[in-house]
Amino acid sequence: MLEKNLKNTIKSYPDFPKKGILFRDILPVFQNPSIFNKLIESMIDKKIYRKSEAILAIDARGFLFGSVIAYKLSKPLILARKPGKLPGKLSTYKYDLEYGSNSLSLQDDSIRNLDNFVIVDDLLATGGTVNSVSKILKDKDKNVLGLSVVVELKDLNGRSKLNFPVESEIIY
């Protein structure tokens, strides 16, 4: 039932943000509190969270889900931010997107005393974004217990580039 509700709620925009991309817009989920609540409950029910010490949310839509999940599970929330958004000593990794490239950074102090993370984002496409964060964590001898996303774009094969469990609520 949740999958059907999500498919009816998530909107698709062809050729956005550039020609050839079919953009899946998850923002309408937030306009329906019942669906949003069921989505969060489904996400936090996954085994990957059981041994996690912290939730690592990816800029920017991952923050929307990661913050609620961290709150519900009483776990610290760590933010992976785009360039120029974090102060202090940072670890940064550049990655390729479905439609370009970017980089993400973590504050070194935010992960210093933690070892086991679940990464949360809105969508898994090519895997580049998630891989960049997992490489930062692995370089710091940290463990990624899994990835939790709302949407997975199966044709872009991002799951195959990751060496940890992936939990998707809906697959296109």
Curated annotation (Swiss-Prot):
InterPro entries, alphabetized: Ade_phspho_trans, PRibTrfase_dom, PRTase-like, UPRTase/APRTase
GO terms, biological process: adenine salvage; AMP salvage; purine ribonucleoside salvage
Reactions this protein catalyses: AMP + diphosphate = 5-phospho-alpha-D-ribose 1-diphosphate + adenine
One GO molecular-function entry: adenine binding
UniProt keyword Glycosyltransferase, yes or no: yes
Coiled coil: none
Broad class of enzyme this protein falls into: transferase
Pathways involved: Purine metabolism; AMP biosynthesis via salvage pathway; AMP from adenine: step 1/1
Localization (cell): Cytoplasm
Functional summary from the UniProt entry: Catalyzes a salvage reaction resulting in the formation of AMP, that is energically less costly than de novo synthesis.
Subunit structure: Homodimer.
Family: Belongs to the purine/pyrimidine phosphoribosyltransferase family.
Protein name stated in the entry: Adenine phosphoribosyltransferase
Organism: Prochlorococcus marinus (strain MIT 9301)
